[in-house]
Amino acid sequence: MNYRIDRRTYAETYGPTVGDKVRLADTELFIEVEKDFTTYGDEVKFGGGKVIRDGMGQSPISREDGAVDLVITNALILDWWGIVKADVGIKDGKIYKIGKAGNPHIQDNVDIIIGPATEALAGEGMILTAGGIDAHIHFICPQQIETAIASGITTMIGGGTGPATGTNATTCTPGEWHIYRMLEAAEAFPMNLGFLGKGNSSQPEGLAEQVKAGVIGLKLHEDWGTTPAAIDTCLSVADKYDVQVAIHTDTLNEAGFVEATIAAFKNRVIHTYHTEGAGGGHAPDIIRVCGEMNVLPSSTNPTRPYTTNTLEEHLDMLMVCHHLDRSIPEDVAFAESRIRRETIAAEDILHDLGAFSIISSDSQAMGRVGEVIIRTWQTAHKMRVQRGRLTGETGENDNLRARRYIAKYTINPAITHGVSDYVGSIEVGKLADLVLWKPAFFGVKPEIVLKGGLIAWAQMGDANASIPTPQPVYMRPMFASFGGAIAKTSLTFVSKYAMKAGIPEKLKLKKTAVAVSNTRNISKASMKLNDALPRMEVNPETYEVRADGELLICEPATVLPMAQRYFLF
């Protein structure tokens, strides 16, 4: 028997389907469902009088015979590869299948089997994204990790040892002893973690020993002396051991100008932090490197997007983070040289063009660890309002722009740092690090954050209430954040050398350790939807930025979505 329902009722019951559009929070961005893997009239949904019951949507098939551990029903997936409606099956902490869930005994085309061993998570009316990756972390305090995961970040990559002066300024975990201690500390957190060693040395031995100890990359920072010799040596070590190099270049141009740094790269791949320059780098033209094939350019979030307040707040941030003294004129000049409205405005447009590939935080060191996702979508909104639809869009939606921007904090940092086999997208075989959002709160406040297929953080009300929803409702840690579950649902990333040398066993790490790979054979072309290579020019006197001859200029935003209306309580 057929029963016909109108589109609105269907969307309210099972979530949007092909042709329906969803607004992202209070932005001017609208995504449209491109494909629906579910079957009309045969959808699965959990609840009293609903479908997932024994003999109906739930089969008697055991876990051993193919039933999944968790099914997320009727979710709207937003990822770099597409925007689709589907059920998602999770098994052994990994994404098992994206498709149609149910009982194959009575339903057709079922590729996700629901059985007695299967838990259900309602995705109707929700947006499902991959957990975010923040690839510019100063590990200044462990509380950052709570803030990050509560915002939808599930992987953090960077360096540090706590609030030491070096860590406050540079993302480096220097030396074997510190590396071992940070790997041990990582055991406590429901977060995938990878550490960067100090990359500043003109001789390779001190760098190689850090890679052997377990870091997944090396960080070159001007506060430690980012000279052409140090750059060359660091990249040579990285090539030998297959780890990534991140760089904060020479703001003062003491050891050479941007041309000297590019020459020192020798066409070897490198991740350039805060490539616009306010966070540090050759003044005023480090932004030029985003046009180089071997450069993987990222932004940090304080300059995202360009607003009327951006310039004013940066000077104070910079003085603190880089241990500068307002009473020393040279220190003030150093700070002022890094803050340029022209390059910050250009950064907005370069992100929209796909010339900047990654957005990260620079946590507590001129960056906000809980705002990577918010700032990314605010930038996308600002560009939608100021520049209109992208030329590559098909249909009356913002799908291409949404896919481009989500790639900046998911798949692209994963590829850059050699962890894309494990995390960074919603694809079969990857760790089930997933985030569910109510569309009205998209990008601002997640509803549920899963780590390795288990709920790690979620919006939760009063624990003494008779139901889960009474106020105060806010993000709280759930069971994947406690006890032995942490080790089974989160990863520690190490170098291939450290993995083969048995460093995880030597340190008696319980958390699953995996090795990074393929960090040296990639390029800008590897960056999903963010691989543009414009010919860059910067006027050294006016700071005007041109890409392929076009002047990049935009007005600062005076008001933004995803802001104060979401944080009244």
From Swiss-Prot:
Subunit annotation: Heterotrimer of UreA (gamma), UreB (beta) and UreC (alpha) subunits. Three heterotrimers associate to form the active enzyme.
Cofactor binding summary note: Binds 2 nickel ions per subunit.
Gene3D superfamilies per record: Metal-dependent hydrolases, Urease, subunit C, domain 1
InterPro entries: Amidohydro-rel (IPR006680), Metal-dep_hydrolase_composite (IPR011059), Metal_Hydrolase (IPR032466), Urease_alpha_N_dom (IPR011612), Urease_alpha_subunit (IPR050112), Urease_AS (IPR017950), Urease_asu (IPR005848), Urease_asu_c (IPR017951)
Pfam families: Amidohydro_1 (PF01979), Urease_alpha (PF00449)
Residues that hold Ni(2+) 2 according to the record: K219, H248, H274
Catalytic reaction(s) noted: urea + 2 H2O + H(+) = hydrogencarbonate + 2 NH4(+)
Places the protein is found: Cytoplasm
GO biological process per UniProt: urea catabolic process
Active site: H322 (proton donor)
Binding site for Ni(2+) 1: H136, H138, K219, D362
Family: Belongs to the metallo-dependent hydrolases superfamily. Urease alpha subunit family.
Organism: Microcystis aeruginosa (strain NIES-843 / IAM M-2473)
Protein's recorded name: Urease subunit alpha
Main location: cytoplasm
Residues where N6-carboxylysine is found: K219
Cofactor: Ni cation
Top EC class of this enzyme: hydrolase
GO molecular function: nickel cation binding; urease activity
Positions with a binding annotation for substrate: H221
PANTHER family registered for this protein in UniProt: UREASE
